Regions:
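Catalytic metal-binding acidic patch
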Residues: 1-49
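Conserved short hydrophobic patches within well-ordered secondary structure
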Residues: 2, 86, 143-147
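Short aromatic-enriched loop/helix-cap "lid" or pocket-rim segments at secondary-structure transitions
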Residues: 14-15, 57-58, 159-161
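Conserved NTP/Mg2+-binding pocket subregion across the NTase superfamily
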Residues: 33-34, 38-125
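Conserved nucleotidyltransferase catalytic core and NTase-mimicking acidic/glycine-rich helix/loop elements
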Residues: 95-228
């Protein structure tokens, strides 16, 4: 059992929750726990199998979050020695070892994200604001994930996620990201959705050298349809 989050890092505020992760052996029922307040703080306990916990380190999009979290963890109980084993692994973790998997993730996720560009185009033709906003939100989130993996940007806390991805991706991408969230100017739903498409185009430009031929073709044809 380990303590994660701002309390383990020594950065807690009055609003920070108590984030506890319970590791169990494979096959053990993962019982959900309803959060509750403890001494004025929200207590959240999650349960994961040991196999699933260590598997995060083999998945690029999850390792970016897991490595900083487990480096800063505070061990509460470690009867089986798994927390000590994790500490040793994350201490010597190398992003370069995951680079091939990261490139495949970027290529596949970029190609799959093209679907939401087409959904935005369809929503615009129907003047369906809710469909446009849903597709835009989905596309924005995927673009951030693509760039975080493409740049190998470790995330210490959700509070800094967007900031560090924008810093790693450059001013042009960060500007497109802000526009997609309607931070720089007033937009209606369709203008915001169009801005999300521009963010996707900029994302695709930045990761073009990571795209497999099939993925690059999907992206190229999608953007050609949108701008036709």
């Amino acid at each position: 059992m380990v303590l994660l989050g701002s309390l383990s890092r020594g950065e807690a505020t009055a609003w920070s929750d108590i984030d506890i992760e319970r590791w169990v052996e494979s096959g053990t029922p993962a019982l959900g726990t309803v959060p509750r307040f403890l001494d004025g703080r929200l207590l959240a306990i999650s349960t994961n199998t040991v196999d699933d916990v260590f598997a995060q380190l083999e998945l690029p999009d999850q390792a970016l979050w897991a490595v900083p979290a487990y480096r800063a963890k505070r061990v509460l109980v470690d009867r089986g020695g798994d927390a000590a084993k994790m500490a040793a692994i994350v201490a010597r973790f190398s992003w370069e070892a995951l680079r091939p998997k990261a490139d495949r993730f970027v290529s596949l996720t970029t190609a799959k994200s093209a679907e939401f560009v087409l959904k935005i185009r369809a929503a615009g033709e129907r003047r369906d604001e809710w469909a446009a906003l849903h597709a835009a939100g989905s596309l924005i989130g995927r673009c951030a994930r693509i760039m975080s993996v493409a740049r190998g940007t470790f995330i210490t806390t959700e509070n800094e996620y967007y900031r560090v991805v924008c810093e790693a991706s450059g001013e042009r991408w960060a500007g497109a990201f802000r526009e997609a969230f309607a931070l720089d100017g007033a937009y209606d739903a369709f203008a915001q959705a169009d801005a999300a498409c521009r963010l996707f185009a900029e994302t695709a430009r930045l990761v073009d050298d990571r795209l497999a031929a099939e993925a690059r073709d999907v992206v190229r044809r999608t953007l050609a349809l949108v701008h036709a």
